Amino acid sequence: VQLFSSKYLSMIDTADIRMDKDSSDFAMIYYSNLALKVTKNNIEKIEYETMDSFVWKSQVINRDYVEVDHHQSQFRSFIWFASGQSKDKYNTMKSVIGYLLHSHKTASNNKAIILNDETISDTPNGGSGKGIIINGIGHMKKLSTIDGKTFDFNKSFAFQTVNTDTQLLAFDDVRKNFDFER
């Protein structure tokens, strides 16, 4: 008997599963002990038992949420120094990080964020903090990183590291002529 034929599979009841996701007004961040609903003006703590939707296990940050004074954050200090202690660059970087942590995107408003060295040359400089920033974001959202120097759109399985639960895709150190429009 072939159990996985359409004859047998059609007898199985289907289940409508609603995955939790961000909206235009809020972003969700999932920790081991609770979820956070982050809006422009507020952070609301939500117990998982009260949610009426599901979350990908791989999108849950593997640590408990503990409220701390964000002014003492090493990552915040790093962003400040990586921004050259310029208030404008610092605020821009905070906006970029916020945009990347917020998963609600539309086809008409979906941006590629490009982090580059202050001085662009044919030799990669490194040391400007791009990798640390991406790593930091990767600790908050499910991230897949692809080597931009060797990436080829025409290669079989070019996106094999991207899964249904991947939230962000980072091309690390892309070639000069990388086709962002593709």
Where are these regions (language model features)?
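Exposed alpha-helical structural elements
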Residues: 3, 7, 70-78, 182
